[in-house]
Amino acid sequence: GDITHIDTRARPYGIKVGANGLIYVAFNGDNAIGEVNPETLEIHYFTIPHEDSRIRRLDVGSDGSIWYVNSARGKIGHLNPVTGEVREWDSPSGPNSHPYAIAVIDDIVWYNESGQRPDALVRFDPDSETFQSWAIPSGIGIIRHVWVTQDKALLIHQSSSNRIGRVRLIQGEPPPEDTSGQIGAQNELLAR
């Protein structure tokens, strides 16, 4: 097949395909998210507030909106690609938390803070605008990307540690002795 190159803004990094078929690109060298039409290769840029913003990764919610990590400013953000409205929240560990990887599961946002040791796994509920955090086992190191499994667990890795971790999400009320946030066998983190 043919390969077509298109010029973009600085350092395209994370990329996701939306349910609408459009391609969303995070720019780690600019304060922007791009929306690419795969038929025409036309790019529409959404400007993210603050020139020092750097977007590493993004994911698409069930409503087609974009969730992203603003690594340089220690924030997570939400972009409505229909209206262009952008909103950001401070990550729990502050401006040096360096959010990196992100995934949306059932409209709950999961991401890591790579500026912490050990990394923190963070859960953000957009409806209540509340955060929860868990320390990730130090053997897993800096998480650079996450994947969602068919059973809605998170797979996390850091290439220099030679390990893959699984985060199993527990639904419902905690048992009398809550084990969420504890590390189980084979680098499994239980998160509620």
Kindly label every feature range from the protein language model.
Residues 1, 37-41, 80-84, 125-129, ...:
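Short loop/turn segments that connect beta-strands within beta-propeller blades
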Residues 11, 29, 54, 72, ...:
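Beta-rich catalytic cores
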Residues 23-29, 66-72, 109-116, 156-160:
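Conserved beta-strand positions in repeat-built beta-propeller and related beta-rich domains
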Residues 31-35, 75-78, 119-122, 163-166:
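A short loop-to-beta-strand structural motif that recurs across blades of beta-propeller domains
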